[in-house]
Amino acid sequence: MNKPVHNNEHRRKRFNKKCPFVSAGWKTIDYKDTETLKKFITERGKILPRRITGVSSRFQGILTLAIKRARHIGFLPFVGED
């Protein structure tokens, strides 16, 4: 007898994303480190969500604050560069 195909058999396997800041042993994120901050924003200048970057909840808040500070000071653009 044939087994019915269930929807969960077609789903992709999930993998655990490790927070890059926790695994590197960071305590804070410096708003002057623009090269690191640019990895967490899109081409249009939006902050990437946790589900894409794998950043922990604690560091997502710190990262968001650092990006906003860098924008206000002028280290990062508010909108993406063409």
Curated annotation (Swiss-Prot):
UniProt-listed Gene3D superfamilies: Ribosomal protein S18
Molecular functions per Gene Ontology: small ribosomal subunit rRNA binding; structural constituent of ribosome
Pfam families named among the record's database cross-references: Ribosomal_S18
Subunit structure: Part of the 30S ribosomal subunit. Forms a tight heterodimer with protein bS6.
Family: Belongs to the bacterial ribosomal protein bS18 family.
UniProt keyword Electron transport present: no
Protein name per the record: Small ribosomal subunit protein bS18
One GO term (biological process): translation
Tagged with keyword Transcription regulation: no
GO cellular component terms attached to this protein's record: cytosolic small ribosomal subunit
Organism, scientific name: Chlamydia felis (strain Fe/C-56)
PANTHER family from the UniProt entry: 30S RIBOSOMAL PROTEIN S18 (PTHR13479), SMALL RIBOSOMAL SUBUNIT PROTEIN BS18M (PTHR13479:SF40)
Functional description taken from the UniProt entry: Binds as a heterodimer with protein bS6 to the central domain of the 16S rRNA, where it helps stabilize the platform of the 30S subunit.
